[in-house]
Amino acid sequence: MYKAIISDLDGTLLNENHDVDEFTINTVKKVLEKGIKFYIATGRSYFGAKEVMDKLNLEIPLITSNGARILNSEGKEIYIKNLEEKYLNKIFEIDYKSIGKDIIINGYSGNDWFVVEDVIDFFINQRP
């Protein structure tokens, strides 16, 4: 028997409308009734994952930001692993426009989400 199930959100736990449906709620409930632990691991921020946790009526640690953060159900950090500044600097030094691709640079700092300003301008003003 399984001791735990760890599920992603998008394309896994959430339906095509990016929401939790009754089937999923009932399935998670049955899993828990069997004594199997259930966790969420996602690339989303804590707040994006917490919304799903609340819909499932769970109080569990959430693995967020592609594994860079683990927070308890109240949002207190259990684990955090940030990129070192030297790697961030290398990422921001790349001339993405010369590559000719629509590359979006974004990241989290705590619970704040940041997107590079040029990308915002592109999507608002320049994209056909």
What annotation goes with each model-predicted range?
Residues 1-3, 58-59:
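Short loop/turn microsegments at loop-to-beta-strand junctions
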Residues 22-127:
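Active-site phosphate-binding/coordination module
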Residues 2-18:
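Asp-based phosphoryl-transfer active-site loop
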